[in-house]
Amino acid sequence: MKISGIYPNQQAINVNHKKNNQIQFSGWQNIESKCLGIFDLDNTLMHGSHEEIKKIIELVSGRNGKKVYATGNTLEQVLSKQKKLALEGIDLPTPDYLISNNGQFLYENIDGFLVKNLEYETMLKNKTHFESEKVLEKMKNFANIPKYSFNDQEYNKLTQMNNFEAIKASDPDFYKSKITHYLWSPSDFMSEYFIASGVNLKEFQKDIQKELADIGIKTKFIDNLYPKKIMDKCPESILLQSHSLRRSADESMTAMFLCPADKADGVEYLKRKLNITYKEILMAGDDDNDISMAKLAKKGAHFIAVNNSSIRLQAYCMKMKNKVSSVFMSQFEGAKGILEGIDKVINRSVNN
């Protein structure tokens, strides 16, 4: 495979290996191993040219690998973005597996169609007993206890807002609270909330975890800090619920997802299903919801943080780099950053 400019070592690796072994190199670390290439989509794999994406897919496939997309998007959103890219002349191939909704659902490519893996869904249900409606009912009461409600001064500010009645109408169960429920990717496996600036997230998680445990539900928490530029693009209903009293001083907004799983759960399931070792798993991401995958580097998996990663992901990966050698901080954004990281992993395996 011809590899261009900024990855000068890759072509030499392929040529030298074929010369010495006369077989195709498989896996990221070992000869004749299966491997996984797992990529976030928005601002990661999809943030690149047709040629860059093509190179990444070829590198995974050429090493006896399965290509996996791990995203916060729903299946429908992924298919829509795939079509949009095609109109721009960019081919985003259908993956072998899709981990969607931040790990809540897993789809398998069967004859070109992404089919929901019911075994994964059943496993999560049996393990957590998670039901979004039950979580929401519990949250309606929990969010309005004094600890998580606006104080008198804050509530007075709220009532003085020009759009107070619209806020109240859009948020009838939560408008007095520092916590509000919203709908972005509705699912039985996810309950979505905005958490006001100033709320202690660790305390909140501990408090609601206990409340849900009382009704037999286990939950995970995925929090994302969305900057102003993203929040400003949201529909009107979301803007009403993420008003100024809930935002940070820089107008960013913390979202908290209560769910039975995260992206790492999907990765762990595929590892078991396909009988693949951690060192043969390579992942890349850019956002807070990719931290769960980055944590798998502790077990030997490889994680690439692309250069346009969120502040939280960068901070976590910088800390991890001091402990493990399988975390790579790329100099490049998106797909180009993935290629740089893959080159680093392959070089390490050859040199070792």
Question: What role is predicted for each listed range?
Answer:
Residues 149-284, 288-296:
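Conserved acidic, metal-coordinating active-site core of Asp-based
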Residues 1-29, 352:
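Non-Sec secretion/translocation targeting segments of pathogen effectors
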Residues 82-88, 206-212, 311-322:
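Short, aromatic/basic amphipathic alpha-helical patches
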Residues 31-50, 294:
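Asp-based phosphoryl-transfer active-site loop
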Residues 50-184:
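Active-site phosphate-binding/coordination module
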Residues 39, 101, 284-286:
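Active-site flanking residues adjacent to catalytic metal/cofactor-binding acidic residues
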Residues 256-352:
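Mg2+-dependent phosphoryl-transfer enzymes with acidic/Ser/Thr/Gly-rich catalytic loops
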